[in-house]
Amino acid sequence: MNRIKDYSKLEFDIDRWIKDYYYFHAIESLVVGVSGGIDSAVVSTLCAKTGLPTYVVCLPLDSKFENSKLSDIHTKNLESEYENVTRVEIELSSAYYHFIHSVNWWSDAQHFDKEEFTANDLANANTKSRLRMVTLYQIAGAKKGIVVGTGNKVEDYGIGFYTKYGDGGVDIA
């Protein structure tokens, strides 16, 4: 395993890579979902440090209070420290519950076993991830930007631990 020896060079290389992508594709902003975890904190900070227009997005959705609080603190700090950063917060719980209600209504009409159909925790978690992804892309579309992924190498490329068309749905990572 190769160990990183020069973190300043790594930061410079990431900064250059993001800027090269940004200018080559003539985009106008970076959009990063901030969960309150370390991965999104690092990625959002690296994006902020580029000096490019960056939208850091909090998407509370039945989140653990601690994660929402950390996300809130981190994004507010970035917005106050970097002039290029805009903080966005969109509460998604009501949209999620409306969707689940609609699916429940449909399952009743189709005579599905409602408990089996709606009680699948993995499916519900994946739906939350996909709702967040759709929201990030809505912001990116409105701001002529790209969605920057926050997954880490082991999760995304090693064991494939991400939601297809959810947190794995990004433009660059």
Question: Where are the language model's segments positioned?
Answer:
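ATP-dependent adenylation/nucleotidyltransferase module used to activate substrates
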Residues: 1-163
